[in-house]
Amino acid sequence: MLTGLFFGSFNPMHIGHLALANYLTEYTPIRQLWFVPSPLNPLKNTQELLPYDLRCELIEQAIRKDIRFQVLRIEELLPSPHYTIRTLRALSMLYPHHRFALLIGADNWQSFDRWKDHHRLMAKYELIIYPRFGYEVNDTTLPTGCRYIHDAPRIEISSTQIRTSILEGKDLRYWLPLPESQDVIASALQSCLSPKR
């Protein structure tokens, strides 16, 4: 059975993440999908990073009734920096009977050659590339083991836009898997942004 690994900040998770996860388990060989939240992303603004436990809890609540999905908090147990190759090696040791596929957006595919040990990633794991607005992927030139899924849903919602809009007091109940989480996210964001003493 092929298990998809969906890495990300999920800061916060939104309906676009779930629509893509649903598509992948229905229209590709992936039968299980594991969300792997990153405790810290060195490429992103950490000032607006919701607490790791809260991000994991929001994902867990959103997927709790769907047996195809689960949350893996493995990166909080691994030393920093959190390179994908290290996490995948750890998962392969913990789950030796699983076949893993790494899910990456077309935006990340453009810079994939700069990822740590990207050749080893491609040699050992299947890569499934999903579309992102503004990024083209020529699937005729993809290496063996890489696949571009043209028809995956593109819901152009970003976690950044959600955070900004929540802080502006906008009602985003239909953008979030759990409409009631908007107040929790707003409170956590205000704590993140308040001056530390």
From Swiss-Prot:
Instruction: Please explain the role this protein plays, according to its UniProt record.
Output: Catalyzes the reversible adenylation of nicotinate mononucleotide (NaMN) to nicotinic acid adenine dinucleotide (NaAD).
Disulfide-bonded cysteines = none
Q: Which family does it belong to?
A: Belongs to the NadD family.
What's the protein called, per UniProt? Probable nicotinate-nucleotide adenylyltransferase
Question: What HAMAP family does the record point to?
Answer: NaMN_adenylyltr (MF_00244)
InterPro entries attached here? Answer: Cyt_trans-like, NadD/NMNAT, Rossmann-like_a/b/a_fold
Which Gene Ontology BP annotations are present? NAD biosynthetic process
* Keyword NAD applies: yes
Provide the species name: Porphyromonas gingivalis (strain ATCC 33277 / DSM 20709 / CIP 103683 / JCM 12257 / NCTC 11834 / 2561)
Mind listing the UniProt keywords for this protein, alphabetically? Answer: ATP-binding, NAD, Nucleotide-binding, Nucleotidyltransferase, Pyridine nucleotide biosynthesis, Transferase
**What pathway is it annotated to?**
Cofactor biosynthesis; NAD(+) biosynthesis; deamido-NAD(+) from nicotinate D-ribonucleotide: step 1/1
Q: What is any Pfam family matched here? A: CTP_transf_like
- Which NCBIfam families did the record assign? nicotinate (nicotinamide) nucleotide adenylyltransferase
The catalytic activity, as recorded, is:
nicotinate beta-D-ribonucleotide + ATP + H(+) = deamido-NAD(+) + diphosphate
Highest taxon listed in the record's lineage? Bacteria
- Give its E.C. classification number: 2.7.7.18
* A GO MF term: ATP binding
SUPFAM superfamilies annotated for this entry? Nucleotidylyl transferase
